[in-house]
Amino acid sequence: MGEVEQAGGSIAGQVAVVIGAAGGIGRAVAARLGAAGCRLALVDLEGAALQAAARELGLEGALALPADITRAEEVAGAARAVAEAWGGADILVNAAGINTRERTLEDLSAEQWEQVIGVNLTGVFHCTRAFLPLMRRRGGGAIVTVVSTAAGLVSPGAGTHYCAAKRALLSLTESINLEQGKHGIRACALSPGEVDTPLVDRRPEPPSAERRAAMLRPADVAEAVYFVVSRPPRVTISDLVIWPSAQISGKYVV
């Protein structure tokens, strides 16, 4: 049998910025990257929730940086704090996301549209734009944006505004790779199917206990994030889709 080359590498000591780290997928990502030895900067809207997450996860030394990611100046302030603490950044995970109970064009208000687009799309732009210079200081880095299978398969259950924002993130990720690859930046659009997070509680019809039990867990998504960011610099995973087995088999339709 020939020699098998190990494709992964250690990310211990790398600076990882996790957006939306106070709960759900972002919290699970923070836990996974912390376990891998990363130095963590945790960003979310509420400072108290960030502090609680860092404490409960045992993430000693993590920076808790409250910021409204729809406001460019607040995100820029978080980036300055990371630069002052560690000089640069190696990993950015865009994991913040929201939705509203109203999902259809008929039911959505203009304010709800702007709110969801603001966090799920414009917020990712602000975070990526603010932290790119810190990654280029390091000679490169990895950006993972948590998208959704709703980006490719428009779902009335996910909502018009949500699907529109998520599909736009696919194009944003492609643009990052096209424009920033020459600087060693690698971007991935990670699209999970249904994930058991508090976000599903906002559906017009909350899922049954059976359906919820079949969903992905935040830790499943976090493990996929770790896989992407731990590849060597020669490897770019531009698009990764992970499904709950029950959903892709057609048992449950969003």
Where would I find each of the regions flagged by the language model?
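Canonical Rossmann dinucleotide-binding motif of NAD(H)/NADP(H)-dependent dehydrogenases/reductases
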Residues: G8-L40
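Substrate-binding pocket helix/loop in short-chain dehydrogenase/reductase
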Residues: R103-L105, Q112-E114
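Active-site helix of classical SDR
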Residues: T128, A165-K166
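A short, exposed helix-loop element centered on a Lys and neighboring polar residues
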Residues: T128-R129, E174
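Residue(s) in the substrate-gating loop at a strand-loop-helix junction
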Residues: S148-T149
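Active-site-adjacent segment of SDR/Rossmann-fold oxidoreductases
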Residues: L153-V154, S175-I185
